[in-house]
């Protein structure tokens, strides 16, 4: 009887080995089949390349606004004057359509630099810089006006110009995105 028991143990062991091997091959095959599908959900390399840009601020004069492109959108970078900063901070919150303090819209220690997405929050036109009654931006499409801090002051727009995510790499360089 011991020969029969040994054969059963060997057959069981062989069967277990075959099941385990077949299961492993099936799992690897499934992983190989689904990997391209899962990988296609990642952003492409051209999208990743546009996800952030670095801008040198050293050539932007005081009072000047420069437009750069980030993710297909215009970005207004303004080197504000001390008078412009003072007038933006003197505005009462009750006078604003979308109340937001000037200090919140700029980075601490870099109060002269304002970075905004240059798209009107009403219907998506590109406002003109250094225009309008508030020394900021004027949207030629429907007449919205923004002050020197990019806050909407007049017109159909209900929101301020959006401040994109950015950091100062140095005193003269920022990374947007």
UniProtKB/Swiss-Prot annotation:
Disulfide bonds join 125-141. PROSITE patterns: RIESKE, TAT. This is Ubiquinol-cytochrome c reductase iron-sulfur subunit. It is found in: Cell membrane. The keyword Disulfide bond applies. One of its GO terms (cellular component) is plasma membrane. The chain crosses the membrane at residues 18-38. Its cofactor is [2Fe-2S] cluster. Keywords: 2Fe-2S, Cell membrane, Disulfide bond, Electron transport, Iron, Iron-sulfur, Membrane, Metal-binding, Translocase, Transmembrane, Transmembrane helix, Transport. It catalyses: a quinol + 2 Fe(III)-[cytochrome c](out) = a quinone + 2 Fe(II)-[cytochrome c](out) + 2 H(+)(out). The Rieske protein is a high potential 2Fe-2S protein. Component of the ubiquinol-cytochrome c reductase complex (complex III or cytochrome b-c1 complex), which is a respiratory chain that generates an electrochemical potential coupled to ATP synthesis. [2Fe-2S] cluster binds at residues 120, 122, 139, 142. The keyword Mitochondrion does not apply. SUPFAM superfamilies: ISP domain. Its main location: membrane. Binds 1 [2Fe-2S] cluster per subunit. The main subunits of complex b-c1 are: cytochrome b, cytochrome c1 and the Rieske protein. Its EC number is 7.1.1.8. Belongs to the Rieske iron-sulfur protein family. It comes from Rickettsia typhi (strain ATCC VR-144 / Wilmington). GO terms for molecular function: 2 iron, 2 sulfur cluster binding; metal ion binding; ubiquinol-cytochrome-c reductase activity. It is a single-pass membrane protein. Residues 88-175 form the Rieske domain. It comes from the Bacteria.
